[in-house]
Amino acid sequence: MKPAILITITSTVVLGTMIVLFSSHWFMIWVGFEMNMLAIIPILMKKYNPRAMEASTKYFLTQATASMLLMLSIIINLLCSGHWTVSTIPNPVASTMITIALTMKLGLSPFHFWVPEVTQGISLSSGMILLTWQKIAPLSILYQISPSVNSNLLLMMAITSMLVGGWGGLNQTQLRKILAYSSITHMGWMAAIMVYNPTLAILNLTIYIMMTLGTFMLFMHSSSTTTLSLSYTWNKFPLMAPLILMLMLSLGGLPPLSGFIPKWMIIQELTKNDMIIMPTLMAITALLNLYFYTRLTYTTALTMFPATNNMKMKWQFETTKKTTLLAPLIVTSTMLLPLTPMLAALD
């Protein structure tokens, strides 16, 4: 893809998300979603092959269905309330339909089937955009309408997303699919707290984006797409093995890493609202994710596969890939726990 075309498409993706973030008019929000969806498809098809074509088609069909449902719910809301302004939604049917449309865009269960398939069919760089930037716009709208959302529906979707994300990632050897199931789980955590404390959901999203960006960049730097290729990291890129270890454990939510902060604060907030069963189930399902993250860390950093002398010497040569953003991302993804009191004060 030519640089000028890539810049135009990328700026359209960013502009679409910004329109959604800063609009208070339902029609402009819908326009922003459409701009974002149509501009992201060429990025998904950047490496033109049948698998990328299939992934882009699946993404388009899912997002188009969600957009159609969103527009229908906006019209129902307009007929009931008489205005286009984003505020509390008086009609329960419109509220439920908007929630379903947004969760379909986010990839929450039971609308999660497209996420692993699309992520696996595209490149690592496109997958990074899909699992980070593309989550911002739907979550921002869910944040704005959180007082009107059907709490039982959202909590049911949240707990099923955590179960699906945990069980789905257990048997995977493809890193992109593992990160896709990880995304489904994290979206479930955000949906669970959205009804009670939407600010915590935004905090969770911020930390999730930093951790996922760092993980994707490490995988791109080492050209790893499977657990087998990741097992050669210690021989080819010895400095990256401990970094991948820390990021994986942070994604799993182990203290004292940054990934522990949102899980801790969400469980604490739910217990404050007299919910006991929900946070207990969430803590148990988190163990499923922790298992496959730990398996990845074992493969990457705790085992050394047989290698030739040429492979062992490879890490000493200067790499051509840029890693400027990697350092701040890894620091923020692993060392934010001391800032927890300050983050808690933001609620």
Curated annotation (Swiss-Prot):
Keywords from the named record: Electron transport, Membrane, Mitochondrion, Mitochondrion inner membrane, NAD, Respiratory chain, Translocase, Transmembrane, Transmembrane helix, Transport, Ubiquinone
Enzyme class: translocase
InterPro entries assigned: Complex_I_Subunit_2, NADH_DH_su2_C, NADH_UbQ_OxRdtase_chain2, ND/Mrp_TM
GO molecular function list: NADH dehydrogenase (ubiquinone) activity
Chief place where the protein resides: mitochondrion
UniProt GO cellular component terms: mitochondrial inner membrane
Catalytic activity: a ubiquinone + NADH + 5 H(+)(in) = a ubiquinol + NAD(+) + 4 H(+)(out)
Membrane-protein topology: Multi-pass membrane protein
Source domain of life: Eukaryota
Annotated localization: Mitochondrion inner membrane
Subunit annotation: Core subunit of respiratory chain NADH dehydrogenase (Complex I) which is composed of 45 different subunits. Interacts with TMEM242.
Name of the protein: NADH-ubiquinone oxidoreductase chain 2
Organism of this sequence: Ailuropoda melanoleuca
